[in-house]
Amino acid sequence: MLFYFIFIIIILVVLTYLKSPHFKGKMGELMVAVHVDKALGDESSLLNNCTIPDQGQGTTQIDHILISPYGVFIIETKNYTGWIFGSARQKQWTQKIYKKSYKFQNPLHQNYKHMKVLEMILSDILEPKYLHSVIVFTPRSEFKTEMPENVFRGKAWINYVKSFNEEVISSMKQKRIHYRIEKEILESSWKTDRQHIEYLKQKSTNNKHLN
């Protein structure tokens, strides 16, 4: 009887985790990592799940940083299902699942902060024009509005990256960029994840007070 009870508890814990934002985020990140491994070869390097101090008192969390001869691509993944509505200038986009709608931050605005942090970190190595923002939703979502040119579903983003065909970063500079970013990354742990979440909550609270 006790064994059966423990088994049920384990199943419930696993099912809860599978539905959690953390698991969904990890699956979205894994999707991008697989695409890079299969399609872009050895000339590019990928940094995943990077928590980096910003220029204030908080942190910013970047899903992927792809360092290639053709530029540095900052990738924000969204493991969302359902219909997606949004445009470049809207502060919030909408996810619709059946009759329910959910608002979420415009990922382009979210990734803009990531871009600015990396721009500062790499200011003496790389010109800002070689930093590129990419937003990747999973294939389980469906866009219901026309999306900006750097927002994709599934592996379609690979073709966008490949459209940059002029080599602008030498192999030596790629290594410098990789090393510089790695120096800034906070060691991944539950503590850094918690600190980032608390910072986002505090920021959201402050914004509400300002409004």
Residue ranges and their predicted role:
Residues 1-60, 67-72, 81-83, 92, ...:
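Surface-exposed interaction regions that form or flank ligand-binding interfaces
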